[in-house]
Amino acid sequence: MIRPFIFLFLLSAISLSAQEEKRLALVIGNANYNVGELENPVNDALLMAKAFDSLGFDVILDTNIQTKYEFVEVIKEFDLKREDYDVGFVYYAGHGIQVGSENYMIPTNEKLEKEDDVYYYGINVQMIIRILTRSSDQVNVLILDACRNNPFEQKWNRNRSF
């Protein structure tokens, strides 16, 4: 189980200095997918949000984000707020899909009929990485607790011939 390691890492990462730091966490748990429900992501997200809160983080929590637009709005909220913080932490639990060398978080209600739909409807993890790396936060952490079994893949025709 990954949660104890996450918690230990979190504790070590946030105790960089004795002074009070402003801490912001974005916590997302997606479970109610249109292709079947995942058992743990929402509960894991709620536990993580509670842990962050107990450690003095301001927490942005969202669960079962249905569309790419809604997902982007939550990320945008985090991005706009994080400038005022010393520590930025993003935790995602839900479906994750890799296409080529890119990784994507998947909203719960998007229909991925073919592999290329991931580009249109998924959230590229690089967006989160860019947000974290361009900030002036002392500490930035991204944890993807993503289910990598791809329930959409059986529908995809991967014939790549011209």
Task: Give the label of every model feature segment.
Residues 2, 59, 68-93, 97-157:
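Caspase-like (clan CD) cysteine peptidase catalytic core
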Residues 32-46:
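Glycine- and acidic-residue-enriched helix-capping/strand-helix junction motifs
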